[in-house]
Amino acid sequence: MMRCCRRRCCCRQPPHALRPLLLLPLVLLPPLAAAAAGPNRCDTIYQGFAECLIRLGDSMGRGGELETICRSWNDFHACASQVLSGCPEEAAAVWESLQQEARQAPRPNNLHTLCGAPVHVRERGTGSETNQETLRATAPALPMAPAPPLLAAALALAYLLRPLA
């Protein structure tokens, strides 16, 4: 039979081996509270990005002029940047995976190249009348630098979604 000490305070304390287990709820409580607080902005990153892509596709289907296409591309860029702005770690992971896809299937004529610089229309004709052949859209040559991650990722995602259309 086990005898207790005279002060009886040690009888109420847990054994030394169990003391660290008593701290476990204090360690687990903050992550559980954060999870129970509800979804954060990063939980909807894919949904938001998909909505930006759908808007891009809808606006590209409305007109085929370069100015309209580039305006749609710029709107997509702004939309995607806004969706991803609050989630830098998640956005970095998404962009990295999409960049890997883009590297595997590069496209020479892409929206980044077409819309990366302002379009200038230069008139070649000498008379007051011109036709379509005398107007040419030109853009300054882009430096040979890697495309920004957002643009490369968007191109990769558009390439991946191409068979669905």
From Swiss-Prot:
Topology in the lipid bilayer is annotated as: Lipid-anchor; GPI-anchor
Query: Which residues are modified by lipidation (GPI-anchor amidated alanine)?
Result: A139
Q: Mind listing the GO molecular function terms for this protein?
A: identical protein binding
- GO BP terms: neuron projection extension
Keyword presence, Signal: yes
Which residues are annotated as pro-peptide in the record? 140-165
Transmembrane segments annotated in the record for this chain: none
Listed under GO cellular component are: axon; extracellular region; extracellular space; plasma membrane; side of membrane
Going by the UniProt record, its keywords in alphabetical order are:
Cell membrane, Glycoprotein, GPI-anchor, Lipoprotein, Membrane, Signal
Location of the protein in the cell: Cell membrane
Q: Does the record's keyword annotation contain Zinc?
A: no
Q: Which InterPro entries match?
A: Neuritin_fam
User: What is the protein's major site of localization?
Assistant: membrane
**Stretch forming the signal peptide:** 1-35
- Coiled-coil spans are none
Q: Which family does it belong to?
A: Belongs to the neuritin family.
Full protein name? Neuritin-like protein
Q: Which gene encodes it?
A: NRN1L
